[in-house]
Design a protein with these regions (language model features):
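Interdomain motor-coupling "hinge/lid" segment immediately C-terminal to the ATP-binding subdomain
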Residues: 2-13, 139-246
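Pre-Walker A adenine-sensing motif
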Residues: 14-32
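Hydrophobic anchor at the beta1->P-loop junction of P-loop NTPases
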Residues: 37
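Conserved lysine of the Walker
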Residues: 45-46
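Accessory nucleic acid-recognition modules appended to NTPase machines
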Residues: 65, 200-355, 360
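Short glycine-rich substrate-engagement loop in P-loop NTPases that contacts/grips substrate
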Residues: 67-97
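Structural recognition of the conserved hydrophobic beta-strand(s) that form the central parallel beta-sheet
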Residues: 125-131, 152
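Domain-level recognition of nuclease-like catalytic cores that cleave nucleotide substrates
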Residues: 393-418
Length: 418
């Protein structure tokens, strides 16, 4: 790796990065903080770096003070930790002053955290992205020495999706023609998710298949040196098919072995951990489980509805619950649970006194009674401040045994910010 290559990369990025058209996303950062943005591939991490760069340029920072390096650049293949110093040398051979660094997919270079810590120690401002949740692990935090703040990045919310397709929310968006327009767009978002680059693609399944294959091979098979690709593929598919129910490691192992592919519970545990590290999977615990059960029996959801849709037929009920999981996880993260002990409640946030059921349709009395009965029972054990049933389009309210239960269509719920 040579210094001249980094001079070229720095100059190239300075030419185009300020002109990139962006859908503005919520981004509230401390002026002198250093940040690590982590999320699944194509969630929009690079665009958040561009957005931050454009904010700085608007606030008077000179473009010459910006150093952006994307480590997915094929010219940087084979880069080692010893080559990082060439970035500093290249910049200081071009300009004077103290640059602000933006490093995209830096986890591609082994040992990156030591370099990032050195920059922070030397009072550089640094913004980093990566597609591996291990970047948020205690090991990395220890190496970084608490010098970086982490931000999880997800694909577009529905409101961000609407910005991307240039649909504005008018004053009374819940009613009339505007409501009909929003529901049409929600159907596409509900089915195919919110990856920024996907928004304007017509062949959405093809795009999503391509993304999944990159995640599968680059972030799973290659990174973790997996030899039994068939078992891993089956594990992903069985997780997708089990999205609405608690799933034990033993059950997953048996489902895979039933196809004739050997796969032990310990191997399944490794696969699930890899899927979590690749930011493909969200996992939540049963609030009332014992410690061992918390580790072995969880509910698993996909980080975007489009990825889940690749694996299931008749997907409506699974997609609705998956969307609820994503929406709640973004806000509550590790404070989000499900409840399963004599009663079944899809989502429970004990710190907020919030319980949420996902039910695609409320068209029959049996469904209504099941969902309401579970919420009332939970309220009897742990008094709730808010109880909700999220549907695809049904709306209303039920009061039972002193508990007010809101019935909300998902498209309204996600736009109202919970």
């Amino acid at each position: 790796m040579e210094k001249e290559l980094f001079r070229t990369i720095i100059a190239e990025s300075q030419e185009y990065i300020g002109r990139i058209h962006l859908v503005q996303r919520p981004l509230y950062l401390e002026e002198y903080g250093n940040y690590v943005f982590v999320g699944v591939r194509q969630a929009g991490k690079s665009y958040l770096l561009y957005q931050r760069i454009q904010q700085l340029l608007t606030n008077g920072v000179d473009i010459e003070d910006i150093v952006y390096v994307n480590f997915d650049d094929e010219r940087l293949q084979g880069m080692s930790v010893a080559d990082f110093d060439f970035i500093l040398q290249a910049y200081h051979s071009m300009y004077e002053g103290q640059p602000i660094f933006f490093f995209d997919e830096i986890q591609n270079v082994e040992g990156w955290a030591n370099f990032a810590r050195r920059l922070a120690n030397q009072k550089y401002r640094v913004y980093i992205t990566g597609s591996n949740a291990k970047m948020l692990s205690r090991d990395i935090e220890t190496v970084l020495g608490g010098r970086y703040l982490d931000i999880s990045v997800f694909s577009y919310s529905f409101s961000e999706y609407l910005k991307a397709v240039e649909v504005l929310l008018s004053k009374n968006w819940q009613y009339g023609r505007k409501a009909n327009e929003l529901q049409r767009h929600f159907r596409t978002y509900f089915d195919w998710g919110g990856f920024p680059e996907l928004v304007h693609f017509q062949e959405k399944r093809i795009w999503l298949n391509s993304l999944y294959n990159r995640i599968f091979f680059n972030d799973l098979v290659v990174r973790h040196k997996i030899k039994n690709e068939d078992a891993l593929r089956l594990c992903v598919r069985r997780l997708a098919e089990s999205v609405k129910q608690p799933c034990s490691l033993n059950r997953l192992s048996n489902l895979i072995k039933a196809t004739g592919t050997p796969c032990s519970p310990s191997t399944v545990m490794e696969y699930v951990r890899y899927l979590q590290e690749s930011c493909l999977l969200i996992s939540i615990d049963n609030y009332v489980s014992k410690f061992v059960e918390k580790e072995t029996i969880k509910k698993h959801y996909f980080v975007d509805n489009g990825l889940l849709h690749l694996f299931i037929n008749n997907p409506n009920t699974s997609l609705l619950e998956n969307l609820c999981a994503i929406t709640l996880y973004k806000k509550y993260a590790k404070g989000l649970y499900y409840y399963n002990k004599n009663i079944e409640v899809d989502f429970y946030v004990p710190d907020e006194g919030l319980a949420v059921q996902a039910s695609y349709q409320m068209s029959d009395g049996e469904t209504i009674e099941r969902e309401v009965k579970a919420l009332v029972a939970l309220h009897g054990l742990h008094p709730l401040k808010r109880a909700m049933i999220i549907t695809y389009e049904d709306e209303g309210e039920i009061v039972r045994d002193g508990l007010r239960i809101e019935i909300k269509p998902a498209w309204k719920w996600v736009l109202e910010g919970l």
